[in-house]
Amino acid sequence: MDSSPLVRPVETTDSASWLSMRCELWPDGTCQEHQSEIAEFLSGKVARPAAVLIAVAPDGEALGFAELSIRPYAEECYSGNVAFLEGWYVVPSARRQGVGVALVKAAEHWARGRGCTEFASDTQLTNSASTSAHLAAGFTEVAQVRCFRKPL
């Protein structure tokens, strides 16, 4: 990747790319289920995720996404208004190039704008790549259930 990605709110025109990446991130769900959830989000019918950000290359290629919510609690977070990274994905060809960090920074900006002072996430215990990505983005591991907290 030659330059920084543009990170912006997901749009209807991003549906196919978002669907493809969601199917990769969460293969236990069917692509039809993901497609239905995307349609519900874009129509404003769901509360979670509260926001979806997409990273795109200068040529418009989708590089990753972040799905965000605000929760009343997350592991080791006590503010009562915690931004939560519900889903975070970067396409394999764009990994280790700053795309994931760019998504997290944009998510932090979104969270601060909603009054959040903490940002949390989680991952499976066996997902060492995700753990490394969270740590590289500034999160601190706070529990062995692989929950993360990041002050904003």
From Swiss-Prot:
Q: Which Gene3D superfamilies match?
A: 3.40.630.30
Catalysed reaction, written as an equation: kanamycin B + acetyl-CoA = N(6')-acetylkanamycin B + CoA + H(+)
Q: Does the keyword Acyltransferase apply?
A: yes
Question: What EC number is given for this enzyme?
Answer: 2.3.1.82
Q: Name any Gene Ontology BP term.
A: response to antibiotic
Residues forming the N-acetyltransferase domain are 5-152
- UniProt keyword Transferase, yes or no: yes
Q: Which GO terms describe its molecular function?
A: aminoglycoside 6'-N-acetyltransferase activity
Q: What class of enzyme is it?
A: transferase
UniProt keywords, alphabetically: Acyltransferase, Antibiotic resistance, Plasmid, Transferase
| Residues reported to bind substrate | W26, Y73, E86, D122
Function statement: Catalyzes the transfer of an acetyl group from acetyl-CoA to the 6'-amino group of aminoglycoside molecules conferring resistance to antibiotics containing the purpurosamine ring including amikacin.
Q: How does it assemble?
A: Homodimer.
* Record NCBIfam families: AAC_6p_group_E (NF043067), AAC_6p_Il (NF000158)
The protein, known as: Aminoglycoside N(6')-acetyltransferase type 1
